[in-house]
Amino acid sequence: MVFLFTGCFKPSASLTFIKKTTLPEALGSRVPPESEDVELDALTEKSLVRYGSLIRHYSDRYQMDWRLVLAVIRQESRFQHDAVSHKGAYGLMQIMPETQVELLDKIGVEEATSPRNNIRAGVFHLRSLYRYFDEAVGDDRVQFILAAYNAGLGRIRDAQAIAKYLGHDPNSWRYVKDALPLLSKRYYTLHRQVWPEGKPRSGYFGNYRQTVNYVENIMQYYSDYKLALN
């Protein structure tokens, strides 16, 4: 499926907590006593007012942590609803145009350009990926779905295959992350030992650093949001 096996590539975005704030009433959220001194940056605060209810709604529908979704949006588009990448991905969650067919089949969305549908499509995609990594647990599982959202499920599956061939746990992000560089064409001799066809099933992959940074950035945002938002 195109929606699951293709990914998107985005520049890194830093998150700085610079302004102490109470949470928007629209979210129905409260800061727990132990997190009273945690501060949200102004960009996140403003975006929560605009999109918080949609993020919460579709995260609840598809059983995802809304703070993780918030972290993904921060990394993907910096909360810009009209963001467009050089690959054609668009919106808050940077949905690729070729995902439209599956969107129609799975959730009945005719377009994913509006903030509502873009968020819905993105959260649905995250949940779909979540099901593919049921043997990973905790943060490993989260990191797998983030990597697949960025690089495509197929590439992460290929990296898992290499990790397994090398005798490592294919459900540990630590080892799969280390296997991503080995998807480069320069390791063709290794590929011949892993796959009968002699190369990764989703093709060669040379931009592993971007995917690793992508995952690390979102995990940091997610950690910060879990402290600041309840």
Name the predicted role of every residue range:
Residues 3-57, 81, 228:
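N-terminal export signals and maturation junctions of secreted/periplasmic proteins
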Residues 25-26, 145-226:
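Catalytic and substrate-binding regions of cell-wall glycan-acting enzymes that process beta-1,4-linked
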Residues 38-45, 55-60, 81-89, 105-116, ...:
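Second-shell loop/turn segments in exported
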Residues 50, 64-69, 74, 87-90, ...:
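Extracytoplasmic
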Residues 57-60, 124-131, 220:
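Short glycine/serine- and small hydrophobic-enriched flexible loop segments
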Residues 63-80, 122-123, 145-151, 218:
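Short, functionally critical alpha-helical segments immediately adjacent to catalytic or ligand/cofactor-binding
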Residues 77-86, 129-132, 151-165:
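Secretory-pathway/luminal and periplasmic proteins that interact with or process carbohydrate-rich
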Residues 86-107, 117-126, 218:
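Substrate-binding/active-site groove segments that recognize
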